[in-house]
Amino acid sequence: MTPYVAVIQFPGSNCEYETARVLSHFGCNPKIIRWNEPDLLQDASGYVLPGGFSFQDRVRSGVMASHLPIMSQLSAGIKSGKPSIGICNGCQILAESGLLSESNHDQIDLGMAKNMSGHTSIGFVCDWVYVRPVHPEKSPLLRYFTPNDVLPIATSHAEGRFVLNHVLEARLSDTPHWMYCDERGQSGDFPITPNGGAVAGITAYSGRVLGIMPHPERAIFDWQLPWHFKHRTWTASWEKLIVAFRELL
């Protein structure tokens, strides 16, 4: 059987086809797997959890999907070393499953909270922002980036603020992750941070798993960028993430 990447389609996913298209463009072999086909994950060489609104974001974004039977198979694959990326709702599902904090459902050390500006809830935010990598050299998925890279990216969520317990907070400085920033790589408040938190994405399992709230699949090609980004020279492209992912399969 030809190795393939499982793009997991949950009830309410809406980015699985564009994500699969990007993976295919860069030499991966994506296969969209429904949430009720857990046995098909066993033969996959890697996983991508796409964006969307699984189960209409009822109760809490990602929490209902995180309890589906397919997550047991996904967890086993991740713990065996298979590379995995969760984007937006996929990131929320990984967080609710304990797969971004290497814990379990009984001890969730990392959660995704509602978007805030100061003490005010700001609801759903759909915009273009900038991010930069921290310690990319420590993650196989981020290894082609440098700490000086600044990348534009689309964001589209209402509950995207990373909340870490004290143990993970203390480890964050040594953990490969993505930070929101301005076009010069400097941190700041809203709207530089679209949800009130500085972290845009975080890695786990020796950097082979990435959960990221913004959408790299929407910022891969020049034609996807807003007009005011197109005439700038960027030091990096999200292609580097997909290529690194492909090489880990």
Residue ranges and their predicted role:
Residues M1-I87, C91-E102, K114-V125, G196, ...:
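N-terminal beta1-alpha1 cap of cysteine-dependent amidohydrolase-like domains
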Residues D43, A76-K79, L110-L249:
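Amide-donor transfer/coupling interface in amidating biosynthetic enzymes
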